[in-house]
Swiss-Prot record:
It comes from Caldicellulosiruptor saccharolyticus (strain ATCC 43494 / DSM 8903 / Tp8T 6331). PANTHER family: TRANSCRIPTIONAL REPRESSOR NRDR. Belongs to the NrdR family. This is Transcriptional repressor NrdR. A zinc finger (unnamed) spans 3-34.
Length: 153
């Protein structure tokens, strides 16, 4: 591994430990020339998954799009960025563990709504209103009634 300080091409590993719940290896290294220490992370490279959009276009899966949507839905709500990242991690893992090459944006949206419903109902309704493109207040009320019915059962 090239030293980020002096550019020397060789270093030794001083410490290795799992990170990110075992999905990453964190290594502490020391340059054999300048003796400065630095940290590297090793992660399995996943095969790209394509997302099929509503208009049938395909684009590479981008977790930041999910996170941005969740952040907007959770604005001014008691939901931490750690909780939001956990949702995105869970969804990303479910997608990759499905062993599929493609997934529809609709399926991803449903996964997000399912997770938000369990975490914060207001954030869920906000996300659903944009995702399902509520046309008027009646559509909004219908979704709230469904949520209340599920809560009672």
């Amino acid at each position: 591994m090239r030293c980020p300080y002096c550019g020397y091409e060789d270093s030794k590993v001083i410490d290795t430990r799992p990170a990110d719940e075992g999905r990453t290896i964190k290594r502490r290294r020391e340059c054999l020339k300048c003796q400065k220490r630095f940290t590297t992370f090793e992660k399995v490279e996943r095969q790209p998954i394509l997302v099929i959009k509503k208009d049938n276009r395909r684009e590479e899966f981008d977790r930041s799009k999910i996170l941005n949507g969740i952040i907007k839905a959770c604005q001014k709500r008691p939901v931490s960025i750690e909780q939001m990242n956990k949702i995105v991690d869970e969804i990303e893992n479910e997608i990759y563990n499905s062993m599929r090459d493609e997934i529809s944006s609709r399926e991803i949206g449903e996964m997000v709504m399912e997770k938000l419903k369990k975490l914060d109902e207001i954030s869920y309704v906000r996300f659903a209103s944009v995702y399902r493109q509520f046309k008027d207040i009646n559509t909004f009320i219908e979704e709230l009634q469904k949520l209340l019915t599920e809560k009672i059962e």
